[in-house]
Amino acid sequence: MDFIPTQTFYGRRWRPAPVQRYIPQPQPPAPPRRRRGPSQLQQLVAALGALALQPKQKQKRAQKKPKKTPPPKPKKTQKPKKPTQKKKSKPGKRMRNCMKIENDCIFPVMLDGKVNGYACLVGDKVMKPAHVKGTIDNPELAKLTFKKSSKYDLECAQVPVCMKSDASKFTHEKPEGHYNWHHGAVQFSNGRFTIPTGSGKPGDSGRPIFDNTGKVVAIVLGGANEGARTALSVVTWNKDMVTRITPEESVEWSAAALNITALCVLQNLSFPCDAPPCAPCCYEKDPAGTLRLLSDHYYHPKYYELLDSTMHCPQGRRPKRSVAHFEAYKATRPYIGWCADCGLAGSCPSPVSIEHVWSDADDGVLKIQVSMQIGIAKSNTINHAKIRYMGANGVQEAERSTLSVSTTAPCDILATMGHFILARCRPGSQVEVSLSTDPKLLCRTPFSHKPRFIGNEKSPAPTGHKTRIPCKTYSHQTDLTREEITMHVPPDVPIQGLVSNTGKSYSLDPKTKTIKYKCTCGETVKEGTATNKITLFNCDTAPKCITYAVDNTVWQYNSQYVPRSEVTEVKGKIHVPFPLTDSTCAVSVAPEPQVTYRLGEVEFHFHPMYPTLFSIRSLGKDPSHSQEWIDTPMSKTIQVGAEGVEYVWGNNNPVRLWAQKSSSSSAHGNPISIVSHYYDLYPYWTITVLASLGLLIVISSGFSCFLCSVARTKCLTPYQLAPGAQLPTFIALLCCAKSARADTLDDFSYLWTNNQAMFWLQLASPVAAFLCLSYCCRNLACCMKIFLGISGLCVIATQAYEHSTTMPNQVGIPFKALIERPGYAGLPLSLVVIKSELVPSLVQDYITCNYKTVVPSPYIKCCGGAECSHKNEADYKCSVFTGVYPFMWGGAYCFCDTENSQMSEVYVTRGESCEADHAIAYQVHTASLKAQVMISIGELNQTVDVFVNGDSPARIQQSKFILGPISSAWSPFDHKVIVYRDEVYNEDYAPYGSGQAGRFGDIQSRTVNSTDVYANTNLKLKRPASGNVHVPYTQTPSGFSYWKKEKGVPLNRNAPFGCIIKVNPVRAENCVYGNIPISMDIADAHFTRIDESPSVSLKACEVQSCTYSSDFGGVASISYTSNKVGKCAIHSHSNSATMKDSVQDVQESGALSLFFATSSVEPNFVVQVCNARITCHGKCEPPKDHIVPYAAKHNDAEFPSISTTAWQWLAHTTSGPLTILVVAIIVVVVVSIVVCARH
């Protein structure tokens, strides 16, 4: 069985157990449902005995002599003490309640006489994890036949009838918060169940997780250790399906898996790592044997449990929790390392040498590793006020108060443990660590410490108004972490003066030390290890001996400046305290700038106190992101369109602004006001119309004059050619000429000279005729009806209750429709997208972070050679250099001159901060759109979560809605993305296994804990110079650090369509793009018969006030009469207006006040109330607010809506030129007819 049908396995409704029809008499009673343990039976017997003895004791005291009362006294005193002692160790209230609930619904699964896991009764099923092998400890449940589901790692069977009352209910409702299980509280957040690390363990598989009502919300399968918390692997329920949540690196929590992998071995003897039974497994009794045991288990998963247990003898006293993590330092010692700058002496071997300095924290705190040990006294005891370091004569001690750390000024020491120091320092170019007891105890190392700024403000300190943002800081806790450092036994130290002679006999006296020797007497050579005095030779001359002091009872740090004793040395590891963890940091919040809203633009006046980042992006298709650091007072103006803009000032929250279509003048006034109004809204359209109108007037006037000239020429030409011909009166009137034979220009000249009044009267006659004709044409034009329809919100009326349509994929923009079905009243329908999520399908390629170069202590072979051996490490390099460290030079202490060899090793691994500070490279595939939609059917409102894929239905009672697929397949994510902290970058990267040195991906691994580490850092070993022991090498700087400095703008700030990018999981929220197809199947129960709804008669509709392009800025009053009181559906059948309310109460008579939104300056729309319709008409004024912080609830008009007043003025303006043109055409036609008739 590869799957479990949801409806049959999990989806059953809870029903009470059926009533039994008969009870067979001869059958024995049902077996007990629970097998009580021996301890529980003893407690029960003891409690019953106490209850039985109490009344008898009272009777004895009253009837008999007091001499018989003493025997029951010890019983009476002993019985109450037992429960009182148990009350001290009882679990908390949350755990007690959970134990009561699960007491009857879970049963242990036994394997080889031990509890391997649990089976749980949920609903009508018995559920047991498939990986939990064994038999259920109940005779009824042990006989059941289980069906296995490998997908969910579960086995299930039907609950026996006699045990149905013991089963628990289950629920799919899981709001974020805390839940209960056997070991306390379980936190549910971001779709994950987590518990504090240590509260769950192998053997808990199958335990249920309850809510506060006692219902099961999940069943535990295992867990994944994530440091301070453990993520649980569970099977849980969603609304319509079963799901399994499996964190990365989760481990099955059956006890059998623990027994197989978690045992340690010593001389073929297996034992639990936290309880070694052997005597040598105690550091205080056998240090060398204990270190060898730990070295053998160096790669064991339970190494640290073994380390903790071997630091104490079985009869020893366990340390307090505050010092438990210091116990590992009992097996270590400080050392003398190489220091680059010891003060006036220059470089030198120093007891306080600095090994490494980290500055990965966002708050500027430094983490320093030194060669001394803090918190451990010289006597190898834990003392937080002491420091021990390696001096010339052995281990020395100093007070912790003498420790100081400084850069350009003294630092604040925040925490110390062992080799590590946490300090908050000022910026500087070097770090100094010193002990004030001796000026020589000082070490400096070059380190560039620059101020770290987090957020968008470079404030020196978070003063004034503050907020907290996510960041990375070093934890001050000393608990176990995944970071560790390697230790090994100290190198062999040359020692002399151990050979003594008595006559010809020579002996070697180690003097309470363990030594290695190699002595030569003639041709005889003796070598070995000695701890007691031994006789070497009987020689005539003194033998030549080379002796080394060996110490295999203690570890020291695996430093590159200290040689190791052997090639395969006894090694161990201890954890590194103060890990880099997720936290929140306080940052300053810059005062908001002064903002001035204008028409289509916003002006900012900045007065920053320190450099502050100002970023802008458009919420349309082209984000056009820009950002700049502002550190001086200045003003800046940005353009704001209808699609909106988003700006971020410093660490303030993002602000989104949208421009409204507003103007300072009205569209219903004089021509100047109208032109100003449309110029504010549509400048290009207005200029185009005015230019076209002017061109029309000029062309029409010029063409009219040309036609008149042509007509006059045609009618006068015949008479001018005939001498003495007299012009008829009709022709003279038609051609505006005199009947005299004199030339026209001469007549005009004569009238201008002698009678100007007659000149003007004759010239005004044709002009008057033209004006009269133009007015007539204008009056005809005014009789034409002018109407322009614009597109508004999608408002439709459907004729069936099975319908398909589309809605905009924009948050807050409603889709409204009226469903009309014959015989039923109209049913209003509204759909609004509340939230949308575009979740891509990701395939993780690898993670990358800062690398750590591991340089083991070099192996130096005096008077001989060494060979390299391959190791399975990333970018591993090994070289052997001969002829190094001349005779007794530096720290090698070799007795040969040119035959000494050094084997240098170096490799790369993930840095200490990799777990908390890393980037993930993903390949992006198809994305799925999930929307949260509020659906209103009549008076029913419900919000549903549905996948917009055209397949997954959303149900509201009996109605079904199928959304999608979306009209345009689009995603803001490229085919490759990089996720770093809470930011997503659309960037390409090198494939896995092909990283380049100094680039992103120079070190790669599948997860932060996997062993498949790949690295390419151009690592090369160099020949060591004479002097101190060291391992020189060259390497390309970290590509991850370079990428963090040079990375581009994250998609969070540069996403188109106003997308909000988030991670965990990677998704884009509330993107404004495309349309969503909707397929609806409305159930009959939602409809109301027409005879049951009011019958309304509408009288009049008056638009009382109207502001266009505003959020429901119009108010219409509709007077009505109705046959009865009831509810009516309200709907607008015109695209020019959107009604706010879908349903309103009606009385027998009255008036309805309806709010509507429109983008038209003069809307004309049809409103339906119940079964009646009426047309509303009104004139709207522009909104006063030019910029608003919300998007318009209606669609903008594709073409400018023109008011009636504007049409009238346009008609007045164009009627005159058109009339002149018409008259000119008529004159030409008449003249042409007359001339043709004469011929």
Curated annotation (Swiss-Prot):
Q: Where is this motif: Nuclear localization signal?
A: 55-91
Q: Which reaction does it catalyse?
A: Autocatalytic release of the core protein from the N-terminus of the togavirus structural polyprotein by hydrolysis of a -Trp-|-Ser- bond
PTM field: Structural polyprotein: Specific enzymatic cleavages in vivo yield mature proteins. Capsid protein is auto-cleaved during polyprotein translation, unmasking a signal peptide at the N-terminus of the precursor of E3/E2. The remaining polyprotein is then targeted to the host endoplasmic reticulum, where host signal peptidase cleaves it into pE2, 6K and E1 proteins. pE2 is further processed to mature E3 and E2 by host furin in trans-Golgi vesicle.
Q: Where is the segment annotated Disordered?
A: 15-95
Q: What class of enzyme is it?
A: hydrolase
| GO molecular function terms attached to this record | RNA binding; serine-type endopeptidase activity; structural molecule activity
Motif Nuclear export signal: positions: 136-146
Q: Where is the composition biased (Basic residues)?
A: 57-95
Q: Name one GO cellular component term.
A: host cell cytoplasm
Q: Region Host transcription inhibition: which residues?
A: 36-62
Query: Which SUPFAM superfamilies does the entry mention?
Result: E set domains, Trypsin-like serine proteases, Viral glycoprotein, central and dimerisation domains
Q: Which InterPro entries match?
A: Alpha_E1_glycop, Alpha_E2_glycop, Alpha_E3_glycop, Alphavir_E2_A, Alphavir_E2_B, Alphavir_E2_C, Flavivir/Alphavir_Ig-like_sf, Glycoprot_cen/dimer_sf
Stretch list, region Interaction with the capsid protein: 710-714
- Annotated site, Cleavage, chain positions: W253, S254, R321, S322, A742, D743, A800, Y801
Region Ribosome-binding: list its residue ranges: 91-105
For region E1 fusion peptide loop, the annotated ranges are: 884-901
Where does the Peptidase S3 domain start and stop, copy by copy? 105-253
Q: What else is known?
A: Belongs to the Old World alphaviruses that usually cause fever, maculopapular rash, arthralgia and myalgia.
Any domain commentary?
A: Structural polyprotein: As soon as the capsid protein has been autocleaved, an internal uncleaved signal peptide directs the remaining polyprotein to the endoplasmic reticulum.
Task: Please report the name of this protein according to its UniProt entry.
Answer: Structural polyprotein
Instruction: Name the species this protein comes from.
Output: Barmah forest virus (BFV)
